[in-house]
Curated annotation (Swiss-Prot):
PANTHER family: ARABINOSE-BINDING PROTEIN-RELATED (PTHR43649), DIACETYLCHITOBIOSE BINDING PROTEIN DASA (PTHR43649:SF12)
SUPFAM superfamilies: Periplasmic binding protein-like II (SSF53850)
Endpoints of the signal sequence: 1-22
Organism: Pseudomonas aeruginosa (strain ATCC 15692 / DSM 22644 / CIP 104116 / JCM 14847 / LMG 12228 / 1C / PRS 101 / PAO1)
Protein name as catalogued: Mannitol-binding protein
UniProt xrefs under InterPro entries: Bact_solute-bd_prot1, SBP
Amino acid sequence: MNDSIKACLAAACLALPLLAQGAETLTIATVNNNDMIRMQRLSKVFEESHPDIALKWVVLEENVLRQRLTTDIATQGGQFDLLTIGMYEAALWGAKGWLEPMSGLPADYALDDLLPSVRDGLSVKGTLYALPFYAEASITYYRKDLFQQAGLRMPEQPTWTQLGEFAARLNRPDQGQYGICLRGKAGWGENMALIGTLANAFGARWFDERWQPEFSGGEWKKALDFYVSTLKRYGPPGASSNGFNENLALFNSGKCAIWVDASVAGSFVTDKSQSKVADATGFAFAPREVTDKGASWLYSWALAIPASSRAKDAAKAFATWATSQAYGKLVADREGVANVPPGTRASTYSEAYLAAAPFARVTLESLKRVDPNHPTLKPVPYVGIQLVTIPEFQAIGTQVGKLFSAALTGQMSSDQALAAAQQSTAREMKRAGYPK
């Protein structure tokens, strides 16, 4: 081999690591939900078309993700370039200037295609701070086969009382079949998302118009008594450890007759590759009780860029790709139209999608009905259905969630949990200077 060839080969070998080092690393923090895991898997398509961007994934359990992101963004730590957040964080962090505005999006992104309730929930004073990956309401899942065998009929929108009665009829713990599955895992976005909407349906509210907590009221007592007694009697063992993913696994394995949770689960419970009850699952609106105001939540997992990111352009490129119509088509082509991330775009709800996704009509109608500005039967000073959009809510909701989880395990009574929630919330609100 002559010297000139050797020199060329040596130069080429040296260039390879330099090319690899030249790629900009984009660190993405996300939640370990199925749709996000699919996004991570399909992100190879993005990397192929963006060889100058190398993706680094940090995938965390929901409560852990929220804690990590809150700490990082409040301290401007800069650990992450792209965050998976919800409407609560988008509103508060956007207002504080902690997030980059999602402006200057390409025309083919079709911003006007986003559902108004979702776009508004991720905006502050008309400025969009996060791009919605999927959006959800809460709906009722139930086993059509079990209802038919028992001679029961699920209403289009049941009451919680009716669900309790159905759960009693369908509870067969000796056969590994439980009447109802509900979130019990403590967390402001876990058990309190479910309990918050249940309480709304019973006519309760977090605060009165003077920002005084209302856990001492009769509506909260009825709501929590129902939740605890129903889940203790007719729920699965260890319900206090179950969040969205745990209950999804239980329902898919045929262990839950009824499940009230996020509409995004629709594509998973009807997927025969992961659900034993895909053909036997029915869908209804989230239960009401004395009202349907605030009976169904509104939530979106969305992608946002922290102001501390050192890779803002790369982050916007990926966020735009992952929330685009083109990404939806990619999912439809590779994994089936029913698996397209739901709830964010009007164009998703084509006739083909509606035909392939039996949960789609209930989901879309629920998303049209929700109103975070008027979330409860009685007037309130806050915005938010299953949450209260104030900075203090994350700590308050987490603490109340722990107390209600303790009531579920029998460590304290419902009355004791409510009294403790009233005291701790009043103390936190006073410390924060409410009413403001």
